[in-house]
Amino acid sequence: MLFTGGPSTELSLSSELLRDIASADEICIIVSFLRLSGLRLLLDALREFCSDPRHRLRIITTTYCGITEARALEQLAQLERTEVRISYDTRIERLHAKAYLFLRDSGYSTAYIGSSNLSHSAHTDGLEWNVRATQVENPQ
């Protein structure tokens, strides 16, 4: 399924991510930029997810362009069973990937890959391009 965002879109990326958070066993997120405005859309669900001792959250982000907000990282650092890695290299390697992976012990894992960083506009009304792929639809 393709998510393009924008004000006329019925489905938002954040609403789909919230649905997947509720049924995941492990979550891996890689985004260039992590903003508090985007984290707030998912924070309650992530907090509940991380309260389960069987679950794990891993996030990779960067300080590239100074856009990632320290307050967002501080909020994530307070979550149980959460690992946050930050790339500080702004000269040689510029991490620009965006992916949200929801692993399930059942084998029904889901990935969202595209252009959306973790920001409010990228997850709600911004013009983005993301595709959802599921292990069931794409077993290889």
Please describe what each predicted stretch is.
Residues 1-140:
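PLD/PLD-like phosphodiesterase catalytic module centered on the HKD motif
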